[in-house]
Regions:
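Conserved small/polar residues in nucleotide/adenosyl-binding loops
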Residues: 132-137
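Short, acidic loop-to-helix structural element flanking the phosphoryl-transfer center
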Residues: 61-62, 80-114, 120, 124
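Short, well-structured alpha-helical segments
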Residues: 34-41, 79-87
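An amphipathic alpha-helix signature
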Residues: 22-23, 37, 41, 61, ...
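A metal-dependent, Asp-based hydrolase signature
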Residues: 48-83
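Short, glycine/serine-rich, charged loops/turns that create anion-binding
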Residues: 119, 141
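Active-site neighborhood of HAD-like aspartate-dependent phosphohydrolases
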Residues: 2-42
Length: 142
């Protein structure tokens, strides 16, 4: 462990709770919010993989929008909630233990970074809200 100088994390589903956008709207979505959130995430991953296999790359935000549209239709969520859900996705909540873990690692002088399929703009917004001590990649494509 002495030779480890940096720790790299995935953002979505590791540092940030991808279900938190839907959870913040559970009063409007109702009891189906968790199923909806899980379906949205599953669809998002499926779209990413399929488009990659088909060599039809779309950036992560476009995939997020497309998967939200399909999920809203499947769960009969009012289309007026689309922009609210997308805005909340830009500022996903971190998992509750993450701030303390990152703080502890930073205090031990580890360099902390994110490696993600998220766009730099999305990652910058997430980190600006929650974790200014994380290093983000400067390249827009992985």
């Amino acid at each position: 462990m002495k030779n480890i100088k940096a720790i790299i994390f995935d953002a979505y589903g590791t540092l940030f709770d991808v279900n938190s956008a839907a959870e913040k709207c559970k009063d409007k979505i109702g009891d189906k919010w968790e199923g909806f959130a899980n379906y949205w995430r599953t669809t998002q991953l499926e779209y990413t993989w399929l488009r990659s296999l088909m060599k039809r790359h779309k950036d992560f935000w476009q995939v997020t929008e497309d998967s939200l549209d399909k999920s809203m239709k499947a769960y009969k969520i009012d289309s007026s909630m689309r922009n609210e859900l997308l805005d909340l996705y830009k500022i996903l909540s971190p998992f509750k233990e993450v701030p303390e873990v990152l703080k502890s690692l930073k205090e031990k002088d580890f360099k902390l970074a994110i490696l993600s399929n998220g766009t730099p703009a999305l990652l910058n917004e997430l980190v600006t809200v929650s974790y200014t001590h994380l290093t983000l990649p400067t390249n827009s494509r992985v």
